[in-house]
C-alpha cells in the first residue's frame, strides 16, 4: 500500500500504552536501558484494545494484575533523533498484593511515593500522569468517606 507523502508521519510513530499502577500509596516504575524510570506498558498491537494492552503489558513486565481505569494523558515522546513514540497513559487499579517481579525488559522495578516522583529521571509526561492519578485516587477516597 502506498502512503501519500502527507500521511507518512501519521504512520511513522508506534503507540505505547502505559499504566499508572499505585499500591499502598506508591507508584510502580521500571528502569529502562537509558537509565530512565518509566511506567509499565508497551506497544499496542494491531487490532488490540488499548485497555487490554495495558493490562497485558503490566502483567508481563511486573506480574501485577490490574484493572484498567480512565485515560489520563496522551503525548508524543521524542526519545532520540529519528525515534518518536506516541504515549497513552491510563490509571490502573492494582489487584496484586505481592511485590512486582521485573521482567528481562527492564533493569529493576521500584515503588515510589508521590513526593519522590518529581526528582526521578523520567519524561515529564509520565510525571504528569502519575500526579493526575494520585490526585484522582485521593479524590475517590475522600468521596467514599
Listing of model-derived features with the role each one plays in the protein:
Residues 37, 104-145:
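Nudix hydrolase/Nudix homology domain
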Residues 64-74:
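A short coil-to-beta-strand element that immediately follows conserved catalytic motifs
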Residues 76-99, 137:
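Active-site-adjacent beta-strand/loop module that shapes the phosphate/pyrophosphate-binding cleft
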Residues 22-60:
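Conserved Nudix-box catalytic region and its N-terminal flanking loop in Nudix hydrolases
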Residues 19, 71, 90-92:
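A structural signal for short, well-ordered beta-strand segments
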Residues 1-18:
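Acidic, metal-coordinating catalytic segment for phosphate/diphosphate chemistry
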Amino acid at each position: 500500500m502506498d502512503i501519500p507523502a502527507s500521511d507518512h508521519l501519521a504512520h511513522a510513530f508506534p503507540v505505547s500504552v502505559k499504566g499508572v499502577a499505585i499500591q499502598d500509596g506508591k507508584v510502580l516504575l521500571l528502569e529502562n536501558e537509558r537509565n530512565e524510570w518509566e511506567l509499565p506498558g508497551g506497544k499496542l498491537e494491531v487490532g488490540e484494545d488499548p485497555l487490554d494492552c495495558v493490562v497485558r503489558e503490566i502483567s508481563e513486565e511486573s506480574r501485577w494484575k490490574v484493572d484498567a481505569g480512565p485515560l489520563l494523558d496522551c503525548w508524543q515522546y521524542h526519545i532520540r533523533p529519528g525515534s518518536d513514540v506516541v504515549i497513552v497513559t491510563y490509571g490502573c487499579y492494582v489487584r496484586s498484593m505481592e511485590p512486582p517481579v521485573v521482567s528481562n525488559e527492564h533493569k529493576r522495578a521500584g515503588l515510589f511515593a508521590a513526593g519522590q516522583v518529581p526528582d526521578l529521571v523520567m519524561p515529564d509526561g509520565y510525571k504528569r500522569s502519575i500526579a493526575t492519578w494520585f490526585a484522582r485516587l485521593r479524590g475517590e477516597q475522600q468521596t467514599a468517606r
